[in-house]
Amino acid sequence: MATASPAADGGRGRPWEGGLVSWPPAPPLTIPWTWMGPSWGQHPGHWGFPALTEPSASPAASLGIFEVRRVLDASGCSMLAPLQTGAARFSSYLLSRARKVLGSHLFSPCGVPEFCSISTRKLAAHSFGASMAAMMSFPPQRYHYFLVLDFEATCDKPQIHPQEIIEFPILKLNGRTMEIESTFHMYVQPVVHPQLTPFCTELTGIIQAMVDGQPSLQQVLERVDEWMAKEGLLDPNVKSIFVTCGDWDLKVMLPGQCQYLGLPVADYFKQWINLKKAYSFAMGCWPKNGLLDMNKGLSLQHIGRPHSGIDDCKNIANIMKTLAYRGFIFKQTSKPF
């Protein structure tokens, strides 16, 4: 897949133009639905963030410590990242975008939100809630879609060879909203070791009846291709990339089994993001225990059953969404084949 190219406006382009915006991660906080109340944050709209407690005596004091740092437009491909910056100022580019969305009366000449007359505030408030909902998104990513994948395979102690994929889940994650838009999920019948071991069933939760009579890997790969086409992911103008928890799935497991069976590996499986590497870039530490460490480091609850392929995909998607909220831009980590 093609890599993103900088947009003409200095990298602040929309994702479908190949641009991206990057800024330091901001701590999660509540942004008010309106600035009509006597204090900052009186009418909070949460969007999943913990509430922010600020002194209510002086609105001006509150305004002095926060800068609405990144406001692009109402396309939904932007986010507000309030930062504790002291003397906050907008660039002329960001200010012009902010005024288009919020209305110029909400801003002083220097770009800092100010409390205007009651009539002006009421006028601006009519469309403010909808504008905030559109703006309160994520930093533009390099890809339109992330395809979250996590295989489960036959296994035993000691390890059996060759291993065979028995669960094949993919979540289509929108790169703008970081929401799951579509799911591909199939079980695969192993052919070399058709009988699952007790160790495998205990680890993955997959019982024999779940794989008996299921399609072969070749048939599943054909259905993956059909699903990719149906979802518009094969369009050359759509940028997408797989995301895995580690390199094993697409560097070892899939190419190894395809080689054993004499099957080709589609090009879209040859580029991916290793979530462990992305997390280490964002958080500054390596998640030794994979998803468990990443969920713990981000104060997230683990979803579902460990080593369930589809549940692991949901955890990966949740971790990605949380990192994106903090301003992280995901980049390909795999090297070209």
UniProtKB/Swiss-Prot annotation:
Mg(2+) 2 binds at residues 150, 249. Mg(2+) 1 binds at residues 150, 152, 312. CDD domains: ERI-1_3'hExo_like. The active site is at residues 152, 307. Disulfide bonds: none annotated. Gene3D superfamilies: Ribonuclease H-like superfamily/Ribonuclease H (3.30.420.10). It comes from the Eukaryota. Keywords: Exonuclease, Hydrolase, Magnesium, Metal-binding, Nuclease. AMP binds at residues 152, 307. It holds the Pfam family RNase_T. InterPro entries: 3-5_Exoribonuclease, ERI-1_3'hExo-like, Exonuclease_RNaseT/DNA_pol3, RNaseH-like_sf, RNaseH_sf. It is an enzyme of class 3 (hydrolase). Its cofactor is Mg(2+). Its EC number is 3.1.-.-. Binds 2 magnesium ions per subunit. Residues 146-320 form the Exonuclease domain. Interacts with PRNP. This is ERI1 exoribonuclease 3. It comes from Bos taurus.
